[in-house]
Amino acid sequence: MDHSVLNVLVCPICKANLYYDKENQVLVCKADKLAYPIRENIPVMLVEEAKKMTLEEVKKYG
């Protein structure tokens, strides 16, 4: 994933910065507890494609 892209992407719901989880290939919005998938190096920033995360899952991102 190109880090210059990460600098401009924000959560489509709340506009918060996203955390890049390289291992799981997702972009995480801690505020909305959503994980947006990255497929073939392309972030899928559609709310309907995002996975809802538990509070415990979100906590591991700090």
Curated annotation (Swiss-Prot):
InterPro entries (alphabetical): Trm112-like
Cysteine pairs bridged by disulfides in the record: none
Domain of life: Bacteria
Residues in coiled coil: none
Any matching Pfam family: Trm112p
Cellular-component GO terms for this entry: cytosol
Family: Belongs to the UPF0434 family.
Protein name as catalogued: UPF0434 protein FTL_1400
